[in-house]
A protein has these predicted regions:
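Membrane-proximal interfacial segments on either side of biological membranes
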Residues: 1-137, 154-255
Length: 255
């Protein structure tokens, strides 16, 4: 993603057999508020200092982010989140070798993310995202839905040379908006679901995402099923309603 207007100096360095770089990037952009949807002005400042040595097959670029546009993160998380916007603050480094690049550091995100599997937007802020070799670690990250309900996200994104991303996320839901479909979909139902329970999402680039939910709907949840269309009447075997007691018996039979 764009980082802004850059003023960067690059020069040949005999000692490292490569190019040393130093500079500053300033970006003026707008970010929607997660609760109100109103856009606000953000000034992002990013500093870079380091070197690139093709002769040594190595790189070391230290990057200082301060309200830096988070759209660049979408390239790493695009397989699981369809939208990423906001900003990040904290020191990170791009390190080599050049044929096995990593991004390491600790960044505090203030980001809006839309989960690809459910199309529900969430917001994270204030916690620290740990970037480690071959790993982006989301540990005890507070996430919020657009109503301000809070839950906890844990997960990891792994990669090789900033490619072949794999995702594994686990969310402990506490009255969080877990599903929000306002028009009848191909399965002839729509729903707004606030839930308690657990949600896991896993997958990898170029492959389907797998979603496993063990949840209980809470206050405010709505479910509507269109049984009026001919194909719904003949093809509604995908849904079965049970009372609470029979559901408990059903689960107890699972080995």
């Amino acid at each position: 993603g764009p980082l802004g207007n850059a003023n960067i100096t690059a020069k040949w360095d005999e000692e490292i057999e490569g190019i040393s770089v130093e500079g500053r990037i300033v970006d003026l952009y707008r970010v929607p508020d997660a609760l109100t949807g109103r856009e606000k002005n953000i000034t992002g400042i990013t500093t870079v200092n380091g070197w690139i040595s093709p002769a040594r097959n190595d790189i070391q670029i230290n990057v200082g982010t301060h309200n830096t546009n988070a759209s660049f993160i979408h390239g790493f998380l695009g397989g699981i989140f369809k939208e990423v916007n906001g900003y990040v603050t904290g020191p990170i480094s791009i390190i080599g070798p050049l044929n096995d690049v990593n991004i390491v550091g600790d960044a505090v995100p203030h980001m809006n993310l839309r989960l690809r599997a459910t199309n529900v937007p969430y917001h994270i802020e204030g916690d620290t995202l740990h970037l480690r070799p071959y790993l982006f670690d989301f540990k005890d990250i507070s996430i919020y839905d657009r109503f301000g309900h809070r839950s906890t996200l844990n997960g990891q994104v792994t990669h090789r040379n900033m490619k072949n991303f794999k995702y594994d996320f686990h969310v402990n839901l506490h009255e969080l908006l877990a599903y929000d479909e306002h028009e009848f979909n191909s399965d002839k139902f729509l729903a707004t679901v606030f839930a308690n329970g657990t949600l896991t999402v896993s997958g990898s680039d170029g492959h389907p995402l797998y979603v496993n939910a063990n949840v209980t709907p809470t206050k405010g949840s709505v479910f509507a099923y269109d049984a009026a269309t001919p194909d719904a009447i003949t093809g509604n075997s995908f849904i079965e309603f049970r009372d609470r007691d029979s559901l408990q018996t059903f689960h107890s039979d699972i080995k």
